């Protein structure tokens, strides 16, 4: 129902996920070829040179560890590796969530330019993501509060675009939008 969401996939939709992998690989190839044909190295330069707006794509994988032992795990991992290496320059971004940092393969995690952590029960999990910054141990447990590691570590606040006095009201208000 969200106009900016092309599709959503569930873990048990093996055929749909395999089709998604093929489609995204083709899209990555198409975008790389497009940039090459115009002699530019990034989607921003392509837009500047051609005046055309190639849309930005964001792919979200919630709970990375949940795909472990699924028949498509290897192919999906290869796709995520490719996006993490090539995606930024061609306008394809990858967001992956995991309950613990060590649930992500280091090979993939090392390609992430930005990392974000919400409050964790184990402070070492926070430090593993953002480093030994004092912010890691003083992070307030406020809904939507997070630490984001870019060049430096910043405190960020996320908010839902709806009002509500409790979680149920917020969820219902989100559904009504």
What are these regions (language model features)?
Residues 1-41, 51-124, 137-138, 177:
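P-loop NTPase catalytic phosphate-binding loop
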Residues 124-150:
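Phosphate/diphosphate-binding loops
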């Amino acid at each position: 129902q969200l106009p900016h969401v092309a599709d959503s996939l569930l873990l048990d939709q093996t055929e749909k996920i395999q089709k998604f992998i093929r489609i995204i690989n083709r899209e990555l190839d198409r975008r790389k070829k497009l940039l090459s044909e115009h002699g530019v190295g990034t989607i921003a330069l392509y837009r500047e040179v051609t005046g055309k707006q190639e849309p930005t794509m964001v792919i979200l994988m919630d709970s990375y560890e949940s795909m472990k032992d699924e028949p498509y795990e290897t192919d999906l991992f290869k796709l995520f590796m490719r996006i993490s290496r090539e995606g930024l320059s061609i306008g394809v971004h990858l967001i992956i969530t995991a309950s613990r940092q060590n649930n992500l393969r280091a090979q993939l995690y090392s390609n992430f330019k930005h990392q974000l952590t919400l409050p964790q029960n184990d402070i070492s999990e926070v430090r593993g993501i953002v480093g030994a910054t004092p912010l890691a141990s003083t992070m307030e447990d406020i809904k939507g509060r997070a630490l984001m590691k870019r060049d430096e570590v910043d405190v960020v606040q996320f908010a839902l675009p709806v009002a509500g006095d409790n979680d149920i009201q917020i969820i219902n208000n989100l559904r009504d939008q």
